[in-house]
């Protein structure tokens, strides 16, 4: 091979190598990664502002009409003056003597849903229903703090006590045995209020002849008939034998009970025919309007008259002169009260002098305390104060002071039949059996 041929081949190899390099893709430079970002510190968490629990106070009662509602609202007003940040829940259930409220309360208590405090009659209704069954807190410390042992009468202290402890705070004293009448009707006819049962029946005949219903009765729920019966019982047998009915010392099969039933049967001949459809305050309206001459009911009628602007009312003991059939509204502290602290302050208001002086003139009752100013009370309540101090005090049947709630219910059942059939023998047998079933009579 010639030298020229060799150089030609070498030149060709060089050219081909150059072409291969030129055709090779240009490498993309690897980008330099950016510097790692400095981690951002999370801001310090600020805890949410806690929302304070709303302060409430639930009071359960059956005070829905006239003076009783006004008195309750006055107590609420006093409470909110001291504790303006507390919302008061007024849990009322309408129905005189708690006829509708008591079953509603029982359902709540047994279901573990107690109100903060509730209205309950002093005596067996309180003790037998709620204390012995373990649903209430004792209030001994509160009584000592407030000095109540020095201002509540001894008899009242005894009735709110059980097993050496105080269980409720009495806010008032009521009298059940009052005959209320329309003064204008009486004066226009020259009538005088009757003080004995014989005088009552003589006057009732005169009223009937004039076209006036002699006795207004509103016994929807039947308790008002039981109320009427307790007044007749006390007037027939006197204070000691009457009290003996509730201890087993007076025989329910005895002649005095029979006489009382006969008197009541006769009295029922003079009542308004629609009595079973009316409440006690609607019956009182018949007296206010002059359609009826009289009604036998507790002294809450005084508050009803005040609320309705009726000033022509008179009163007399219907065959029970010298006897004071007493009852008291109280408030207690149930175990598990949702707002216990507020409930205790409520009880302080109920037992205070200021609370009782504000409440009772409106309610138509007198103070349970013995240091209230009598000048704050109207004419009737002043006489009630005098009678409370000197009369024989006996407990009310219809309003839970004399008998247990279950016993009262049995007597109400007897009265339900009696106001319809007026069967004295059957009613007396039923009353005697009720005493046995209550465990008091043998």
Task: Enumerate the predicted regions with their spans.
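Extracytoplasmic/periplasmic solute-binding protein
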Residues: 162-171, 177, 201-249, 292
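Hinge/lid segment of periplasmic solute-binding proteins
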Residues: 51, 121-176, 201, 228-230, ...
């Amino acid at each position: 091979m010639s030298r020229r041929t060799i150089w030609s081949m070498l030149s060709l190899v060089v050219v081909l190598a150059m072409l291969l390099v030129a055709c090779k893709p240009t490498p993309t430079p690897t980008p330099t990664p950016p510097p790692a970002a400095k981690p951002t510190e999370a801001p310090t968490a600020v805890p949410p502002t806690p929302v304070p629990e709303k302060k409430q106070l639930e009071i359960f009662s059956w005070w829905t009409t006239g003076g009783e509602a006004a008195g309750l609202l006055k107590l609420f007003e006093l409470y909110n003056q001291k504790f303006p940040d507390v919302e008061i829940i007024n849990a009322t259930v309408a129905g005189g003597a708690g006829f509708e409220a008591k079953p509603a309360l029982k359902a709540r208590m047994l279901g573990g849903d107690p109100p903060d405090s509730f209205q309950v009659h002093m005596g067996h209704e309180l003790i037998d229903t709620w204390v012995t069954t373990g649903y209430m807190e004792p209030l001994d410390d509160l009584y000592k703090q407030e000095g109540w042992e020095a201002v509540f009468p001894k008899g009242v202290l005894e009735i709110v006590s059980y097993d050496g402890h105080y269980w409720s705070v009495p806010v008032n004293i009521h009298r059940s045995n009052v005959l209320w009448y329309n003064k204008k009707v009486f004066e226009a006819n020259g009538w005088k209020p009757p003080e004995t049962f014989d005088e009552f029946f003589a006057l009732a005949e005169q009223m009937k002849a004039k076209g006036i219903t002699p006795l207004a009765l509103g016994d929807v729920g039947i308790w008002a008939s039981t109320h009427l019966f307790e007044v007749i019982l006390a007037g027939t047998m006197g204070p000691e034998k009457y009290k003996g009915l509730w201890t087993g010392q007076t025989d329910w099969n005895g002649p005095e009970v029979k006489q009382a039933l006969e008197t009541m049967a006769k009295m029922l001949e003079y009542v308004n025919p629609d009595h079973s459809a009316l409440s006690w305050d609607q019956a009182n309206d018949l007296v206010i309007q002059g359609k009826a001459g009289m009604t036998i009911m507790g002294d809450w009628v005084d508050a009803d008259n005040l609320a309705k602007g009726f000033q022509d009312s008179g009163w007399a003991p219907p065959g029970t002169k010298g006897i004071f059939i007493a009852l008291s509204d109280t408030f207690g502290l149930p175990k598990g009260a949702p707002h216990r602290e507020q409930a205790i302050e409520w009880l302080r208001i109920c037992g205070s002098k200021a609370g009782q002086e504000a409440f009772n003139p409106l309610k138509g009752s007198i103070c349970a305390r013995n240091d209230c100013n009598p000048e704050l009370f109207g004419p009737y309540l002043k006489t009630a104060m005098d009678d409370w101090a000197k009369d024989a005090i006996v407990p009310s049947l219809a309003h839970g002071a004399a008998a247990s709630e279950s016993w009262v219910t049995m007597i109400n059942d007897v009265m339900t039949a009696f106001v319809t059939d007026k069967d004295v023998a059957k009613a007396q047998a039923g009353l005697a059996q009720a005493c046995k079933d209550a465990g008091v009579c043998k």
